[in-house]
């Protein structure tokens, strides 16, 4: 019997690092000890990082066009030209329309970030960028092409690097970053190779082969201490007709092969004593992922809860969070549409998941934290730059106070090697044959056990659960009120403003651990904290103060209303059924 994939990875200790690897650990370690408190580009750490997503630049956006035509200019002699429709502005059409981002919005946003990343944002250690770097394929008059998509990606990558030259940027592929959208076959392919070329400046040299194979990769953002794994959620998405989920008995499926690769990387990072952020585009919710992909993924989240710091996604354009529970399928929520930005989705999430979370005892016990809270992991979905709502991004603060004290504890860590795709596929195929035989035996056994809990031994609770090194402490949500820039020109200077923070009322979160998010979710669902139901202030300034009419009693309580208002970046204020 041949060893398993994980065993093979460990047996490669003391050999040289192959192409399917983390890179040379000795060179990274030497660099880390030169100046321990720096990111992977040598910049001193400040304890903050940026999450940005769904920029959707549109080269065909044109000032003076109409929203009925997706902000594209048609032939004025065409019968398709609407009469009496309002014209869109230079920067955006304002919130509520299905237009992608104007070149001006992208350029001015990145210019603002470049200019104010230190004085306003307080400095950035690394960036997690969760995809959709091309426009939507929603206008038959302007069909997308593969060359346009690749050019859009390469252009945006170059602009991001220009804005953040000393900040490591890790990006994840979006469903609109490929041609045709949503559909992606197993790699290597022309699409994966050309996308690797467009993203060349982001992908570590030693990860290039991996990316060409599956369009996912990994990258150290703090050398030898903190990494980010970019997930290709297209291989896990049930909207991708070119794949068939993540069956554990068919390694021809790219989703199954990804899960094997993913587990190997987590195992190796654990052995190196490192922590990991996960980022992807399509969030793991019902109706988005294949169920077997969701199940395999949550199994790994549970098993490696000691090293996974958190997960960030995009795609849905609304700020919210969901919980993934080990050994349970995702909750059933109402579908959403980008056209209407349906508040029903988040409201159904509150009812179906938040309300059903376990109630915390007055005195927390280790048993409750390990046995109950530890079954849950948190996925945060970010608001977008695309101006369908107000453009937005989030800056996280995370704990680096103990980083220097923990360096000496890992001096003698074993150097783990990895291996190339040929080795992975060979060993995985062997495991596949073994698994097939085991499953055949089980099928022939008439005695079946019902509801048997999976035999997975999890790690201890890590920084996602217990405040410690790299635990996210708080966040600040910034937004651009495009309604104030309808008359903007190329000379207009824009200003992103602070919308709210995780420490603001009514959230009052001491940190961003899973237990604190569970408490918040329960408060949102049960209206645990009484507030004035007729008036509440979301942020200083008349434009962000909303009053609920006393004549009409709201169907949702103020804390839930505030959460919904923030989810839709202040662009929607009516959440009544």
UniProtKB/Swiss-Prot annotation:
Pfam families in alphabetical order: Metallophos (PF00149)
Top enzyme class: hydrolase
GO molecular function: endopolyphosphatase activity; exopolyphosphatase activity
Alphabetized InterPro entries for the sequence: ASMase/PPN1_MPP (IPR041805), Calcineurin-like_PHP_ApaH (IPR004843), EndopolyPtase_N1 (IPR012358), Metallo-depent_PP-like (IPR029052)
Source superkingdom: Eukaryota
Annotated glycan sites: 363, 370, 375, 399, 481
Places the protein is found: Vacuole membrane
GO cellular component, one term: cytoplasm
Residues in coiled coil: none
Membrane topology recorded in Swiss-Prot or TrEMBL: Single-pass type II membrane protein
GO annotation, biological process: energy reserve metabolic process; polyphosphate catabolic process
Functional summary from the UniProt entry: Catalyzes the hydrolysis of inorganic polyphosphate (polyP) chains of many hundreds of phosphate residues into shorter lengths.
Family, per entry: Belongs to the endopolyphosphatase PPN1 family.
PANTHER family, per database record: ENDOPOLYPHOSPHATASE, SPHINGOMYELIN PHOSPHODIESTERASE
Protein name as annotated: Endopolyphosphatase
